Amino acid sequence: MKAIIVLLMVVTSNADRICTGITSSNSPHVVKTATQGEVNVTGVIPLTTTPTKSHFANLKGTKTRGKLCPNCLNCTDLDVALARPMCVGTTPSAKASILHEVRPVTSGCFPIMHDRTKIRQLPNLLRGYENIRLSTQNVINAERAPGGPYRLGTSGSCPNVTSRDGFFATMAWAVPRDNKTATNPLTVEVPYICTKGEDQITVWGFHSDNKTQMKNLYGDSNPQKFTSSANGVTTHYVSQIGGFPNQTEDGGLPQSGRIVVDYMVQKPGKTGTIVYQRGVLLPQKVWCASGRSKVIKGSLPLIGEADCLHAKYGGLNKSKPYYTGEHAKAIGNCPIWVKTPLKLANGTKYRPPAKLLKER
């Protein structure tokens, strides 16, 4: 019987390699993993963005406050907070507020010695409330306050709506009418007059001048003592007589004297007290404030709308869940800050093409 021999032959082409797996090109995508370090993958989805600085904006779906009184033209927030004539208007409610005046300029009404008190904080205190309104009535009758009767002083730098001399609506400058003599400390009680259970912010202060003016106005050229007390907080002051710092930036008419302005916060139903001598600025209209508004440092104007307000970048729309760059306070629907970019691998781990078998 003849044997049948079958020969298996390998037929080769000009190439000496064949591919034994799926062909794959080199991958440019590298991700860091917790267990394997840097790994090449076939595809990624970026999860981070690096914002660029832009205008601040209104927070989407939320009332945003820029200036305390948007319709009060040529008025700083400090003017509005003190109710300077021509700077009294509607203060809209807001869930978010922009702190845009880090150092409010001095009101042109009268030179204020800012560094003696916390008065610079007043606009920001008001900005931190959702609802703020100025009372329609005065908290006390200043003309008949203890130590009076008083006439109410005005300033040519504070023209009112009729272009006559005026003064801040939150305070009454109590100048003795006839009894221009020194006085022992006097006490006035400041009642709570807000009607909706709000915090009551009561503004008060005192005027001081050189010895000649103090004698002419008040009959006493000595330093005067003042104390305020409310909500468990007591503050003491002694007035300065002359030797005031130059405040040419104040604007308005030149003034030989200065005023010191402060405020106290009265909780619902609580009475405050002010102990004073000559030159007192007695409280008049008060701020009634309620709710909370988130505050972020920024700049005006507010342009358009944004998902997020960021202290460094302004208004941001959330295109990615994370961001890199400068880390700062942000409010709203904001991406989360991360130190380095994050990527989501949406492909497979890159495997180089398998080595091809050579012909033996």
Curated annotation (Swiss-Prot):
One of its GO terms (cellular component) is viral envelope. Residues 1-15 form the signal peptide. It comes from the Viruses. It is a single-pass type I membrane protein. It is found in: Virion membrane; Host apical cell membrane. Its main location: virion. GO terms for biological process: fusion of virus membrane with host endosome membrane; fusion of virus membrane with host plasma membrane; symbiont entry into host cell; virion attachment to host cell. This is Hemagglutinin. Gene3D superfamilies: 3.90.209.20, Hemagglutinin Chain A, Domain 2. One of its GO terms (molecular function) is host cell surface receptor binding. Binds to sialic acid-containing receptors on the cell surface, bringing about the attachment of the virus particle to the cell. Plays a major role in the determination of host range restriction and virulence. Class I viral fusion protein. Responsible for penetration of the virus into the cell cytoplasm by mediating the fusion of the membrane of the endocytosed virus particle with the endosomal membrane. Low pH in endosomes induce an irreversible conformational change in HA2, releasing the fusion hydrophobic peptide. Several trimers are required to form a competent fusion pore. Belongs to the influenza viruses hemagglutinin family.
